[in-house]
Amino acid sequence: LENITVSFEGFLALNDLNLSLRKGELRAVIGPNGAGKTTFLDVITGKVKPTKGEVFFKGKSLIGRKEHKIARLGVGRKFQSPRVFENLTVKENLEISVSTPKSPLNLINKKIKNDQLDEIEHLMKVINLSKKINSKAGALSHGQKQWLEIAMLLGQKPDLMLVDEPVAGLTDEETDLT
């Protein structure tokens, strides 16, 4: 990010922000409500266009690109509130995230390869939802939905993973498990 400024009708959400990341690097952005943390992620993912500045990923400018095209470049995001397919099972949610290429026909025909099934099983263990594999995602607790969405993001194998408040709304026990 180079000199990113975002102004909403005169309110400066971000003011001349600069940030660079290297492969494998982990960063946490901490601040009070309204400090611009989500706006910062929105700029990277194309949800918000900055008033000024540039965003580069893999040497390409992200400014003006559509959100889905930024995702295809390898940018994955988990939002504050869990966004899972509530009418699908936990397993089906994960099948969507690990299917490659992202083809509706692959999903309809259930063309999931053995290595993808192994990946789903691994992700289920990571999020401790193996016993809920056939449960509808809508029946999960808020915390379990958060975990499922994180697993879905991991299953996509993004080159850049943006996670916005992953423990928001979790109980103390769920936060400790996370």
What would you call each of these model-derived segments?
Residues L1-T178:
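Glycine-rich phosphate-binding loops of nucleotide-dependent enzymes
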